[in-house]
Amino acid sequence: MRVLVTGASGTIGSAVARALIGRGHTVVGTVTAADRPVPAGVEPLVADLFDPAALTAAAASVDAAVHTASSNDERAGELDHTVVGALIEAFAGTGKAFAYTSGLWLHGNSGDTVTTEESPFDPPLVVSWRPAVEKLLEDAVAREVRTIRIRPGLVYGGGRGYVPMLLSPQNDDDGAVVRHFADGSNRWSVIHADDLGELYALAVESAPAGSVYLGTLDESVRVKAAAQVVADKHDARVQDWDPTDAQQYWSVMVEAFLLDQVATSAKARKELGWTPSQPGLLEELAAL
């Protein structure tokens, strides 16, 4: 297949592109500028994803699409609505696959109740627009678009993603310190980018229309344990960070990173034969 991947230079998009190419597919990857790096074999396409006409033109020459791009700012919801709307219109009546990157944050706090694809929505403010976008994809099945919604946990791998930034050692008057929001007792549900890329490739190839999959490891990571791994490596101490103070730097993201989540990817493993095999988050952090 010839597959359009939005955000091909990003953490998720580049992993999806590598997985698709590794399975024999051709990838057209959107980038924001010609000098943005993309995986070997990707056909880069400079495109303004806020422009529906550009998306319609890009979709005309492909057999499937995967949307992973994000503006990572206050326009993220607008971008998703634009991309999803344009690609649904372009693919209507064709049966072509369109995989959308949602997220596990959509489900909010789980506590000790294991989140599945059927768990209710309770998103933090930063992704409060996502239920409406997911509804567009759900409804598009009736228009003969093979939509697939993938909800990844917190993505890591190769030193990329939010985790290395969040837990990066800082210096104060007493030396190096690794800070986590509040007491760090909450759990992150996580997934390596390369494992996630394989999930997307499998889903694009064979997932039924309207499918939803959680893309995460079944064992969550306690945030303070992750912080301790980084601290030990850098001879630093671990410190609680008052969420109110942290909001000066991380704004609405603090609420999301404070979520306590446990989840299962049993559905993806059973239906698609997905088998995550990359190092876990703690192993990754110890190696950085």
Predicted segments with their positions:
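Mid/C-terminal beta-alpha module of Rossmann-like enzyme folds, strongest
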Residues: 2, 197-253
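N-terminal Rossmann NAD(P)H-binding glycine-rich loop of SDR-like oxidoreductase domains
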Residues: 3-23
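NAD(P)-cofactor binding segment of oxidoreductase domains
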Residues: 58-100
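Conserved Rossmann-fold NAD(P)-dependent oxidoreductase catalytic core, especially the SDR/UDP-sugar
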Residues: 84-126
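Glycine/proline-rich active-site loop of Rossmann-fold NAD(P)-dependent oxidoreductases
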Residues: 131, 155-167, 202-213, 219
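Conserved beta-loop-beta element that borders a ligand/cofactor-binding pocket
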Residues: 134-158
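A conserved pocket-lining segment of Rossmann-fold NAD(P)-dependent short-chain dehydrogenase/reductase
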Residues: 168-191, 195
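C-terminal amphipathic/interface module of NAD(P)-dependent oxidoreductases
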Residues: 254-288
